[in-house]
Amino acid sequence: MQDSSLNNYANHKNFILMLIILFLMEFARGMYILSYINFLPTVTSIAVAITSLAFSIHFIADASTNFVIGFLLKKFGTKIVLTTGFILAFTSLFLVIWFPASPFVIIFSAMMLGIAVSPIWVIMLSSVEEDKRGKQMGYVYFSWLLGLLVGMVFMNLLIKVHPTRFAFMMSLVVLIAWILYYFVDVKLTNYNTRPVKAQLRQIVDVTKRHLLLFPGILLQGAAIAALVPILPTYATKVINVSTIEYTVAIIIGGIGCAVSMLFLSKLIDNRSRNFMYGVILSGFILYMILIFTLSMIVNIHIVWIIALAIGLMYGILLPAWNTFMARFIKSDEQEETWGVFNSIQGFGSMIGPLFGGLITQFTNNLNNTFYFSALIFLVLAVFYGSYFIANREKAK
């Protein structure tokens, strides 16, 4: 009994520390990717094309690394992989201090940061306890979202004081996360190493066994990300509001998401499979309706209400979807499988803005991007709704 209590305490301590490490690394990512490089063209000689390329390469590196990181963790162990990641992140961001306007350093740092964050995510996802998955995944996604947003806002404030003087803060945050890592005892599901050919075959096998999940993993991210390029224009040109009022809408959505992740996500635990199905299906349908509604709204107060509803639903849909995916994963392949899943999700987030921007540009109508995003959620609702109904009938 005492050994069990000590083990539970150790697991809880490790989970909390990993949450803090995830928060800090996402904090650094928010500072650099969402804030620092976006401001560079306005305060240095860096061209917008360079920062846009850095932004894209960051997420390409993230998605590509996710695809193989589970296998690398099993082959080399967590200490080597994570330490390498921290070294890459710290060194690359440290270079930004000395070369704040170097195109090579800006792109290189973005790529290295994308690689460095990948193993932390995979370890977090694979270490979640099954009987507490909804609750713990709520905490994981909350740490991710809070880190990104607070990092972005914090860096925005520092840039207003001086555009490049506080660049050292990014590498400092990574250094703190790196130090905290040495107080964590990370365990993998197994440590079996395989030849490269065997690992490649396993990637193909994992992919084939989870094809059912790929539309949801890929298209959810694409549907949301498609709106990113047009939302500022939608706010200022269609709703005719200031940047501050638009920011308030983002904050309201973020607060709704945070509240849902912290308090509503635990509803997923110890509930029936049909409850989980209901949350996922309701989320897809509600997203379709709310996003479609945005195309007809010109009142900022209604937009704020919709933003709150989207945030609240997002905060419970993510843990529910994660729990649904977890049921398909073999217990000894968690790192590899979550890595592949994250890679597919990252690819969806990359193609979403591309489609959203192109649709608006070629049709010259912002509403068409809203219709495109809503249509994706309709397709997901029909596809997975059919699966849930068929699966429910089989269970009977």
UniProtKB/Swiss-Prot annotation:
Gene3D superfamilies: MFS general substrate transporter like domains. Keywords: Antiport, Cell membrane, Lipid transport, Membrane, Transmembrane, Transmembrane helix, Transport, Virulence. GO terms for molecular function: antiporter activity. One of its GO terms (cellular component) is plasma membrane. SUPFAM superfamilies: MFS general substrate transporter (SSF103473). The keyword Membrane applies. Its main location: membrane. It is found in: Cell membrane. InterPro entries: ATG22/LtaA_families (IPR050495), MFS (IPR011701), MFS_dom (IPR020846), MFS_trans_sf (IPR036259). PROSITE patterns: MFS. GO terms for biological process: lipid transport; lipoteichoic acid biosynthetic process. Proton-coupled antiporter flippase that catalyzes the translocation, from the inner to the outer leaflet of the cell membrane, of the lipid-linked disaccharide (anchor-LLD) that anchors lipoteichoic acids (LTA) to the cell membrane. Belongs to the major facilitator superfamily. LtaA family. This is Proton-coupled antiporter flippase LtaA. It comes from Staphylococcus aureus (strain MSSA476).
